[in-house]
């Protein structure tokens, strides 16, 4: 399988413009023979949408953006795109979700189960999902997780308190998957890239699965996202690394030699 990790620089609130940006990246990936394209978390609406989520017409705008992608990609490769959708609960909130766009239609694959709390609390704006989803494609079972849901269940890197009372990553593994698809928006800080690579490599090797992680790039308010999307084989060996602080379409061929492993920036030895 050839998976394209679409390392996007999307604009918060510009749903129509973001849909066009994503579409251009998908077309570039399709020209390279991609079987599946994946965006970062919340790529359609832009990361950290905050109060936009409370606007009455925002949800409708996101639905229109998804339909635009579906209409434009009727003959294109399947696309997993991050976007807010209606919650499964009658709360009036939206859920942070992974959406499959394929053959002129779109459907929800997974709603984010684990949410952050505190100052940047996602729980203020989003309803959590019930469980992570699995996408069956070309003989593969792909478990889909959103950002912090990739945290290891064995506490090898940090302890994560799942507010939902269950561990989404471990439940996916127990259901049987061939690969983990990780849609992320991880802000840059000193050492974060090295830690991410160590943790995701550990997850791939521990559960003997391929792992594909696509990260946001660009800036939003005080946050900067460094991209450097990643792919690992089932031994935890790195197959590909995306560009740092730049948009990228990172194609990973699981049947071949993997993909391009871009170096970490020399000026950021701890990045």
Regions found by a protein language model. Give the residues of each.
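Enzyme catalytic cores with a strong preference for nitrogen-chemistry domains
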Residues: 1-271
